[in-house]
Amino acid sequence: VPKKKVPRKGRSSFTRDEVKTLFQLPDSSNEIGLRDKTLLCFMYASGTRAQEVCDLTVGDIQFYPDRAGINIHGKGQKVRRIGIPCDASNMLKKYIEHRRIINDTGRHVFSSQTHEKMSVACIEEIYSKYIDKAKLEYPEMFRYSYTPHSMRHTTATHMLEAGVPLIVVKNFLGHVSLQTTQIYTEITQDTMNKQLKSWNDKWFLKDNSHFE
């Protein structure tokens, strides 16, 4: 008997202001802070899953003057080619150069304090650390529960809101089905509904006599 699909709960994503705030929290003057800031920015620019970030090696990346081309090793051993913009590319390159592994193609880009290859659990701890910090410092923001996958949701949502075609977002994220990507259009619609409600509450005619 085929199992019934359980509807997924609402997916939390970050607003643009929350993304900017999150990027500012790591102290990039030390090794851990520099790693964490680079990781957060890379995940937003690439929309990658946590495991895909763990698997990323120096040899997967080709740097160009205005961008980087990256081979992402996704689910089912499928590899997809994506590009990230100049700012994210420069940050990633500087981090790799800082680690002195730019010519070591087999090295993993992100490592933990104890292992050469970072784990998903380590990425989860990084997000938990900075989201907890953000909730304390900015109580009016970060009102929901977040995971590393929230950044992937955020990338998809912001791409769609910027007018990027659904099929392009699908390929960028490595979704097998377009139906999976359409989940994010619902988030975008929800964002639009909130904006419309705000407009109605603040600006629409309040005098009901106009309609009598």
Residue ranges and their predicted role:
Residues 1-212:
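Conserved catalytic core of the tyrosine transesterase superfamily
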